[in-house]
Swiss-Prot record:
Disruption phenotype: Male mice are infertile due to arrested spermatogenesis at the pachytene stage.
PANTHER family reported in the protein's UniProt record: TESMIN (PTHR12446:SF22), TESMIN/TSO1-RELATED (PTHR12446)
Identification of the protein by name: Tesmin
Taxonomic source organism: Mus musculus
Family of the protein in this entry: Belongs to the lin-54 family.
InterPro entries attached to this UniProt entry: CRC (IPR005172), Lin-54_fam (IPR028307), Tesmin/TSO1-like_CXC (IPR033467)
Pfam families: TCR
Domain CRC: 263-372
Modified residues annotated as Phosphoserine in this record: 34, 67
A single GO BP: cell differentiation
Tissue spec. comment: Expressed in spermatocytes and adult heart. Also expressed in fetal brain, heart, kidney and ovary.
UniProt keyword list: Cytoplasm, Developmental protein, Differentiation, Meiosis, Nucleus, Phosphoprotein, Spermatogenesis
Length: 475
C-alpha cells in the first residue's frame, strides 16, 4: 500500500525532466537551460549565478554552459549582451572558471603518468607574497609568450611576510601600491601557482626545482616534461618575479624562470664525500661555514667518510712514525715526511721530530736530514742546540741564521774542576759550621754570618785550585 502511494508521488527530478523534455521545450533543438526569472521557489532547484553562467531576462535564452556540438555556430548576439565581462570569448576560447578543480600537467607527482585531476584544496599550501613592480613592461605578442618571457631580475624581489602580515594583507588587499599575489605551492615543492588576489584573471604557473638528497630518487616519467602548467587565462603581468628559497644549511638554489630550465648535467649531483682531503673552506683560506666538517648534525656523513678512507687505506689516520720492533733502539718509518722548504730541519718535520734520518719513502724536497749533511752537523754542534720539541719557537736553529761555527779557544778545558766530590765536601763544611754555632748558643744572625764566611772560604779554595791548574797567578 505504502509502495503504491510513494510510487504515485512525483519528485523534483521528474518535474525538472518534464519541464526540460516536454512538448513546449525541445532540448535537442535549443540546448538552452530554463530561464531563472523571479525568485526561485523552495521546491525548485536554485540556479547558480556565475561570471560565465547567469540569467539575463525571463524570456531570453541563457548562455550555454556546455560546449556546442561540432559545426555549430555561436550567435554574436549572445556575446554582445555581456559588456561588463572583460574580453568575453566563445566557449571554445574561454577557459573554465577557477571554481572546483585544476588540471595539473606534472610528471613529478608520485604514481602519475600524465594529466591528473586534483581538487584545488588538496595538497596546496598558500603563501602570500608581495611583488615589487619593475620599471618596464613585459614584451611579447601572445599572453602565453608574455608569461614565459617574464625573467627573474635582481631589482625585483619576492617578499615572504609573516603570518600576521599575511592576515593584514588578506584583509586589505589594495592597501599598498604593489600588487599583492598569492602563491599556491603544491606539496613537494614541484610547482607554484601565482594567483592574483583581485580575481582569477591573472594566473601564472611556475616550476621550482625540488631539493633532493640523492639524484637517484628523482622521479622519472615516460612523458615529456611540460615547461609550465597553464591554468586558467594567462595575461601579461607587468612585474618581474624573483623566487628565492633558502634551505636549512644556508645554500641558495639556482633561480629558475619560466623560460629557461637547467639541463641534466647542470642539476645538483650527489653530495661529495667529506674528509677525502681538505674541505673547500680550508682550501680557500676561510673558516668552515655551512660545511659538514665539524658539525654534529653531519656526524653520519663524517662517519661514512672516515669509513671510506679506512677502506681505501687502513693506515690513513696512523702516525707517520711507528714504533720499531721489540728490542729495536731506533724508530722506523711508516709513511715518511713531505717537507718542501724546511730542508727537514724543523720541528714540524716528522723525521726530524722523531730524531731519525729521512729515508727513501719520504717525499721531501731539498732534504738536509741525512747522515753526512753539513747543515745538520752544524746544527747539532751549536751550543744553543736543543732537543726537537723542547722549545716551540726554535726558528733560530735554522742554519741560515748562523754565519759559521762558533770559535773555540785552544786553552778551553773540556771539563770543570767542580765535581760532585767538591760539592759534597763544601756542603759538609757548611753543616759543620752550623752545628758549631748551635753548640755555642749563638744568635740566628751570628749563625748565618758564620755559615756565609765558611762558604766564602770554600769558594776561594776552589778558585785557587782552578787558577793554579790554568797557570794563572793570584795577587
Amino acid at each position: 500500500m505504502e509502495d503504491a502511494l510513494l510510487g504515485a508521488m512525483t519528485g523534483p527530478e521528474d518535474e525538472l525532466g518534464a519541464e526540460l523534455f516536454g512538448s513546449e521545450r525541445v532540448f535537442a533543438d535549443g540546448l538552452a537551460l530554463s530561464p531563472a526569472g523571479g525568485a526561485a521557489d523552495r521546491d525548485e532547484l536554485p540556479v547558480l549565478a556565475d561570471a560565465y553562467l547567469g540569467a539575463t531576462e525571463p524570456g531570453e535564452p541563457l548562455l550555454r554552459a556546455l560546449s556546442p556540438p561540432p559545426g555549430a555556430e555561436v550567435p554574436a548576439a549572445l556575446l554582445g549582451d555581456f559588456p561588463g565581462l572583460p574580453e568575453l570569448r566563445s566557449p571554445d576560447d574561454a577557459a573554465p572558471p577557477p571554481a572546483y578543480s585544476v588540471h595539473v600537467l606534472s610528471s613529478l607527482l608520485p604514481g602519475a603518468r600524465g594529466p591528473a585531476l586534483l581538487p584545488l584544496s588538496a595538497g596546496v599550501r598558500v603563501i602570500p607574497v608581495e611583488i615589487k613592480e619593475a620599471g618596464g613592461s613585459v614584451p611579447g605578442g601572445s599572453p602565453e609568450d608574455a608569461a614565459f618571457q617574464a625573467p627573474l631580475a635582481q631589482e625585483s624581489c619576492c617578499k615572504f611576510p609573516s603570518s600576521q602580515e599575511a592576515e593584514e594583507a588578506s584583509s586589505c588587499p589594495r592597501k599598498k601600491d604593489s600588487s599583492p599575489m598569492v602563491i599556491c605551492q603544491l606539496k613537494g615543492g614541484a610547482q607554484m601557482l601565482c594567483i592574483d588576489n583581485c580575481g582569477a584573471r591573472e594566473l601564472k604557473a611556475l616550476h621550482l626545482l625540488p631539493q633532493y638528497d640523492d639524484q637517484s630518487s628523482f622521479p622519472q616519467s615516460e612523458l615529456p616534461k611540460p615547461m609550465t602548467t597553464l591554468v586558467g587565462r594567462l595575461l601579461p603581468v607587468p612585474a618581474k618575479l624573483n623566487l628565492i628559497t633558502q634551505v636549512d644549511n644556508g645554500a641558495l638554489p639556482s633561480a629558475v624562470n619560466g623560460a629557461a630550465f637547467p639541463s641534466g648535467p647542470a642539476l645538483q649531483g650527489p653530495p661529495k664525500i667529506t674528509l677525502s682531503g681538505y674541505c673547500d673552506c680550508f682550501s680557500s683560506g676561510d673558516f668552515c661555514n655551512s660545511c659538514s666538517c665539524n658539525n654534529l648534525r653531519h656526524e653520519l656523513e663524517r662517519f661514512k667518510a672516515i669509513k671510506a678512507c679506512l677502506d681505501r687505506n687502513p693506515e690513513a689516520f696512523q702516525p707517520k712514525m711507528g714504533k720499531g720492533r721489540l728490542g729495536a733502539a731506533k724508530l722506523r718509518h711508516s709513511k715518511g715526511c713531505n717537507c718542501k722548504r724546511s730542508g727537514c730541519l724543523k720541528n714540524y718535520c716528522e723525521c726530524y721530530e722523531a730524531k731519525i734520518m729521512c729515508s727513501s719513502i719520504c717525499k721531501c724536497i731539498a732534504c738536509k736530514n741525512y747522515e753526512e749533511s753539513p747543515e745538520r752537523k752544524m746544527l747539532m754542534s751549536t751550543p744553543h742546540y736543543m732537543e726537537p720539541g723542547d722549545f716551540e719557537s726554535s726558528h733560530y736553529l735554522s742554519p741560515a741564521k748562523f754565519s759559521g761555527p762558533p770559535k773555540l779557544r785552544k786553552n778551553r778545558q773540556a771539563f770543570s774542576c767542580i765535581s760532585w766530590e767538591v760539592v759534597e765536601a763544601t756542603c759538609a763544611c757548611l753543616l759543620a759550621q752550623g752545628e758549631e754555632a748551635e753548640q755555642e748558643h749563638c744568635s740566628p744572625s751570628l749563625a748565618e754570618q758564620m755559615i756565609l764566611e765558611e762558604f766564602g772560604r770554600c769558594l776561594s779554595q776552589i778558585l785557587h785550585i782552578e787558577f793554579k791548574s790554568k797557570g794563572l797567578k793570584i795577587e
